[in-house]
């Protein structure tokens, strides 16, 4: 960190820049005299737009370049959408702050139809997510699900051009970009379980940078951090990346942590679901035990097919 200047590594998409600006404003409000600068950059996931994410392969498609900037001291922190953050970090880096979660649900977006159930047989639905795909296919096997890549504006443009009858996007992203009016239905977790960490913004930095960590401390939201910890522990045990058919959602209700999760075959033909309840301080163990239950109930074979290789140990 240079004098009183803190540099944020961020992707260049409108949503990523919103998240970085949000963190910048929060930091400057908490620390008088601190100047925060954005360092926009392009990631591999931003460049490869003609291939479904699940086929691009690899973890950290949207974060690796930002992490290199941290390691090379070209930036002090990196701001991420938590659903894009791998469960493992390069040596010397770590996730130190998780901001308060926005609405984690998925949004049904259509210009012609009011809900998923209103779609006629054979309707074309766009999504880049195997998690969304498997849940849609299970509920509506009569739909045609096609890949949809690009930033939020690009995806909405393809819907408006008639390429799709409906698309599925994150409620949080639409709200942050002032596009809440495009949401026809916010899909409850019972209908479409969110991605791990969906709706939360995470901040990564060098673990030995005590000054920066102290500056970030006021931005951490304890309840969100506990919920996301449970979801990510489950995902780590499953060895899941952000492009696999895994959904997970934790809630804190009356002091009890309730974790739900699923693993599904992309075509919706198989779905393994489970849930656990426990104490907030046991978030990590709750996630691990639920993952083990899923693996033993059929998730191991589903994930092996998805990875076309070895199932999780």
UniProtKB/Swiss-Prot annotation:
Involved pathway(s): Porphyrin-containing compound metabolism; protoporphyrin-IX biosynthesis; coproporphyrinogen-III from 5-aminolevulinate: step 2/4
Domain of life: Bacteria
HAMAP family reported for this sequence: Porphobil_deam (MF_00260)
Cofactor(s) this protein requires: dipyrromethane
Keyword Nucleus set for record: no
Record note on cofactor: Binds 1 dipyrromethane group covalently.
Organism of this sequence: Enterobacter sp. (strain 638)
Note: The porphobilinogen subunits are added to the dipyrromethane group.
Family stated for the protein in its record: Belongs to the HMBS family.
Function: Tetrapolymerization of the monopyrrole PBG into the hydroxymethylbilane pre-uroporphyrinogen in several discrete steps.
GO terms of molecular function: hydroxymethylbilane synthase activity
Enzyme class: transferase
Quaternary structure and partners: Monomer.
Entry protein name: Porphobilinogen deaminase
GO CC field: cytoplasm
PROSITE patterns: PORPHOBILINOGEN_DEAM
Gene3D superfamilies cross-referenced by the UniProt entry: Periplasmic binding protein-like II, Porphobilinogen deaminase, C-terminal domain
InterPro entries reported for this sequence: HemC, Porphobilin_deaminase_cofac_BS, Porphobilin_deaminase_N, Porphobilinogen_deaminase_C, Porphobilinogen_deaminase_C_sf
EC number assigned by the record: 2.5.1.61
Keywords: Porphyrin biosynthesis, Transferase
Pfam families: Porphobil_deam (PF01379), Porphobil_deamC (PF03900)
GO biological process: protoporphyrinogen IX biosynthetic process
Record's catalysed reaction(s): 4 porphobilinogen + H2O = hydroxymethylbilane + 4 NH4(+)
